[in-house]
Structures are given as structure tokens and as C-alpha cells.
């Protein structure tokens, strides 16, 4: 399997790439503004990395989702997760408290196979100041994990093989991060 990681100019991207490679997968990293959309045809899956700012400021990030939704499996992490939400009609909202290097607990619903084999209670390493809003969440998106404060920590598209996680699976603050990535890599829809 060969996956592409769309690098949204984030220092965590290569930690994510290293973890995915350690799971036995070939990885190519492309900066979000340094490729042609057609180049992604060569890859089996697309991983949308964390990054600063908001999705509309992240190069071709939204175009990748628009072009490959329903054609390629995708996983969005942090900014990538927010971009998935926004692309399908969700709103983003700023948090009153910024999370940077904070581990919080929450629940995963058990419906998303990326959480297969994990307990209902999970610990998530968080590095963000925005979340996908619950208000007006479109029907095509399903919440699959939330923080104890009720913030969306994971979602999936009901029709397409697209998953998003707000937290960082590559962080030491996410004990089950490798298992989540392994589950996603092993998914075939």
C-alpha cells in the first residue's frame, strides 16, 4: 500500500509519516501547494495532516477533498479533520480555551471501524483552537467521538470512506494513536 500525506506545513507531519511507515506502509509526503491534483491518482489512500490556520488557507486541501471524495479513502487529522467538516457543510468554531499539548478524555461511539478494538473511553492528545461545530452538522457526517466537554473529536462521512479525528494520533499523548492509524490503513470499504 502506498499512501500520500498532504503536508499542511505542520511540524507534526513527519512524526505522522514516521508512525505510518512503522506500520509497514509506503509513504509520500507532498506540501499542500506543491503538487497537481492528478498526482494523487497514484496513491491508495490520502492522509490530510495537521496544520496552522484554517482549511481555506491551506493550499489545495479543500480541493483534494472535493476531487477525491468517494474515489479515495481519506483520513483527516486536526486541520485535515476540520477541512473534511467544512467541505461537507459543517461550520468551524473557535474554542475559548486553546489546547496545545493537552491530553483529554472522551468517548468513542463504537460505530467507526478506525476505533475497532479500543475501549469506549479514549485519551486524546490535542493541539488546536478550532473545532467542527455540532450546531448545524450536516446529516452526511456522523460524530464518532467526543470530548467530555461535548466537542467533536472524530467524525466520518456516512457514504464515503472518509474519517476525521481532531486529536493527534502521532502524539505520545494519544496512547491508542498507532492502533487508530493501523485500523484506518486496514480498512477496505
Locate each region found by the language model.
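Short amphipathic alpha-helix with an adjacent loop that forms part of the alpha/beta core around
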Residues: 34-43
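Extreme N-terminal starter segment of soluble prokaryotic enzymes
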Residues: 1-4
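Proline-centered loop/turn at the N-terminus of a beta-strand
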Residues: 73-75, 91, 123, 142, ...
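A short beta-strand-loop structural module common to alpha/beta enzyme folds
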Residues: 26-34
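Catalytic beta-strand/loop cores that center a nucleophilic Ser/Cys/Thr
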Residues: 112-159
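Acyltransferase
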Residues: 172-189
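Cysteine-nucleophile active-site neighborhood
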Residues: 43-117, 181-183
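Two-component/phosphorelay signaling modules centered on CheY-like receiver
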Residues: 17-26
Amino acid at each position: 500500500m502506498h499512501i500520500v500525506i498532504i503536508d499542511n506545513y505542520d511540524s507534526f507531519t513527519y512524526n505522522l509519516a514516521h508512525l505510518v511507515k512503522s506500520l509497514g506502509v509506503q509513504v509520500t509526503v507532498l506540501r499542500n501547494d506543491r503538487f497537481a491534483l492528478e498526482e494523487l491518482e497514484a496513491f491508495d489512500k490520502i492522509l490530510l495532516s495537521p496544520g496552522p490556520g484554517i482549511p481555506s488557507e491551506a493550499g489545495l486541501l479543500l480541493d483534494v477533498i472535493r476531487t477525491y471524495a468517494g474515489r479515495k479513502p481519506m483520513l483527516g487529522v486536526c486541520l485535515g479533520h476540520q477541512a473534511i467538516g467544512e467541505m461537507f457543510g459543517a461550520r468551524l468554531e473557535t474554542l475559548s480555551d486553546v489546547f496545545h499539548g493537552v491530553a483529554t478524555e472522551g468517548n468513542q461511539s463504537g460505530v467507526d471501524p478506525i476505533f475497532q478494538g479500543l475501549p469506549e473511553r479514549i485519551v486524546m492528545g490535542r493541539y488546536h483552537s478550532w473545532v467542527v461545530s455540532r450546531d448545524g452538522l450536516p446529516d452526511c457526517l456522523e460524530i464518532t467521538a467526543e470530548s467530555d466537554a461535548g466537542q467533536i473529536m472524530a467524525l466520518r462521512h456516512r457514504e464515503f470512506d472518509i474519517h476525521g479525528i481532531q486529536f493527534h494520533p502521532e502524539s505520545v499523548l494519544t496512547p491508542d494513536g498507532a492502533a487508530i492509524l493501523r485500523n484506518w490503513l486496514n480498512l477496505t470499504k
